[in-house]
Swiss-Prot record:
It comes from the Bacteria. One of its GO terms (biological process) is translation. This is Glutamyl-tRNA(Gln) amidotransferase subunit A. Allows the formation of correctly charged Gln-tRNA(Gln) through the transamidation of misacylated Glu-tRNA(Gln) in organisms which lack glutaminyl-tRNA synthetase. The reaction takes place in the presence of glutamine and ATP through an activated gamma-phospho-Glu-tRNA(Gln). PROSITE patterns: AMIDASES.
Amino acid sequence: MDYLNEDLQSVHDKLVAGDLTASQLVTDTLETIKTKEQQVDAFLTIDEKGAQEAAAKIDAQPIDADNLLAGMPIGIKDNLLTDGVTTTAASKMLANFKPVFDATVVEKLKAKKAIMIGKTNLDEFAMGSSTETSAFKKTKNPWDLDKVPGGSSGGSAAAVAAGEVVAALGTDTGGSIRQPAAFNGIVGIKPTYGRVSRWGAIAFASSLDQVGVFSRTVADNATVLQAISGHDEKDSTSADYEVPDFRAALNGDIKGMKIAVAKEYMAEGVEPAVKAQIETAIETFKSLGATVEEVSLPHSQYAVQTYYIIASSEASSNLSRFDGIRYGYRSPEAKTLEDVYVKSRSEGFGDEVKRRIMLGTFALSSGFYDAYFKKAGQMRTLIIQDFEKVFEDYDLVVGPTTPTTAFKLGDKGTDPVTMYMNDILTIPANMAGLPAMSVPAGLVDGMPVGLQIIGKAFDEESVYRAGYAFEQATEFNKNVPSFKGGQA
């Protein structure tokens, strides 16, 4: 089963009609993955046995005609815990780690009878923007195999873009769903902070991390997000809000919607060709009956600096649990207790993770806490207030998801600051905890451009409504990758 020209509804119809069984679907999907992985390298682990067993159970009963996820193979980012299936966070530190329980989001998908087909590649501990910091492999962009798929959820994005799976889960701390979605020409949403449980997600920066969804269409995205959303008492940051019917918002009507374009998001750092695509997208919204006006989010220019202080500080705390004692990698060279700590962490973590731990530890140290971490917290408040002011008068904020299209493998790996700036347009929504989605907005020199749609807290419905209307008007989601370049 190649999903390039399929969606949840089309595959579901075949299952309901009896033209396809869940077992056949899994077998076909595994064949597709086996073929395309030679080019893309999106997966770290394929759970062939588990997927076939789950499919057999589904085939033992009639398919529920009202459950679009029944029997659907889904990719899971490898920083989400999966019971009995290796979960590595793409780090040598967790190379052989097998969890004994599922993350809440995985549990919820299984309750909907979705099938976990495998674990997708990512930047180590989700720290990166290209999936090049993975300890195990470098995922390629299906549109050009010489280019990055983005990150940190590059494996999930590439798997969906390549047609290996119909949907996949990712996590987004500073743009790790939206940026790869833009680079791969697919739909990716980071929901409101607290909308989806983080229980069982390996923590990077706990005040920023959020689990979200990749898909080829807005409708599929809404279906999967519906399934994984909701309060979870195991996660203290999970919001006890009723989950609306996201698909009900997909009516294609945005007449009367007030949409803001932040002038800071269209500044000189955005490539002219990318900016032109977004300007065309803005005209599309106007033609659909929305009011579009320019606004200012003045403190967004400080978002990257603020983010790297806060995220690195939280990471240095979260990753202190990997010490060679309880679980994870332990250096075979360690002779003393101090050796266990120092050598296990030095050998188990990659360069980018160590860089961020050091940065965070520095920002939290007693002599520099007020100068860095405290100030970053204050700037975060100002960024939140900017959005609150705009949302008093507008329903949504739109702009480019990324300043450029996908860059070449190896191009930015030696310059961390250049890599960090790649998330300049996605970070503000994480700082404010707002829902934000990237939808395909056309091509520049054969590579996808993403349109970012940011909504008010817990108003994913408006984000989906606008995204769906844009998708229906443009049909950019029907573009398929060329698989050019690389060794293919």
